[in-house]
């Protein structure tokens, strides 16, 4: 990826990064559930909520921040994602939780669009592990 495109991705609206990150996380979790957990179809959605709900994402973010898991660059994206003003109302959660969830999704979206596959894979695997240990 060239420098100009690199900078373009960093400058994207953090909620745009979160939008992309939400899709990436959802696909990763669905793949994990289908291939690893081999659950019945009617249970798949219920199981995926355990990983992708705003509450779960917020708890995971808090844990990862306590562990100082994120790079400085990722912390900048997290802060932008958390502080971004959304014009939609959070469903089934409070604003703080929604913002934390958007923050971790923004980092996922950033890593995906930057094509940082190893770091993205490490983060997605870490999310699965953390949720499984709860």
From Swiss-Prot:
Q: Which Pfam families match?
A: Ribonuclease_3
Name the record gives this protein: Mini-ribonuclease 3
Output a single Gene Ontology CC term carried by this record. Answer: cytoplasm
In terms of CDD domains, this protein maps to: RIBOc
Q: Keywords of this protein's UniProt record, alphabetized? A: Cytoplasm, Endonuclease, Hydrolase, Magnesium, Nuclease, Ribosome biogenesis, RNA-binding, rRNA processing, rRNA-binding
Nucleotide-binding among the record's keywords?
A: no
Predominant localisation class: cytoplasm
> How does this polypeptide assemble, per the annotation?
Homodimer.
* Source organism, top-level taxon: Bacteria
* UniProt xrefs under InterPro entries: Mini3_fam, RNase_III_dom, RNase_III_sf
Which EC number(s) are documented for this chain?
3.1.26.-
Q: Which family does it belong to?
A: Belongs to the MrnC RNase family.
Q: SUPFAM superfamilies in the record, alphabetically?
A: RNase III domain-like
Entry's localization field = Cytoplasm
So where's the catalytic machinery, residue-wise?
Answer: 22
- In Gene Ontology terms, what is one molecular function of this protein? ribonuclease III activity
Job description of the protein: Involved in correct processing of both the 5' and 3' ends of 23S rRNA precursor. Processes 30S rRNA precursor transcript even in absence of ribonuclease 3 (Rnc); Rnc processes 30S rRNA into smaller rRNA precursors.
Names of required cofactors: Mg(2+)
BP-aspect Gene Ontology terms: rRNA processing
């Amino acid at each position: 990826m060239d420098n100009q495109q690199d900078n373009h991705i960093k400058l994207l609206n953090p909620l745009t990064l979160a939008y992309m990150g939400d899709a990436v996380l959802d696909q990763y979790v669905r793949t994990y559930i289908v291939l690893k957990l081999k659950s019945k179809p009617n249970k798949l959605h219920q199981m995926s909520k355990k990983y992708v709900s705003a509450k779960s994402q917020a708890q995971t973010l808090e844990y990862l921040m306590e562990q100082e898991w994120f790079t400085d660059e990722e912390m900048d994206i997290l802060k932008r994602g958390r502080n971004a003003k959304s014009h939609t109302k959070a469903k089934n959660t409070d604003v703080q939780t929604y913002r934390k969830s958007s923050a971790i999704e923004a980092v996922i979206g950033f890593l995906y669009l930057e094509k940082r596959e190893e770091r993205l894979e490490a983060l997605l695997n870490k999310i699965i592990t953390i949720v499984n240990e709860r």
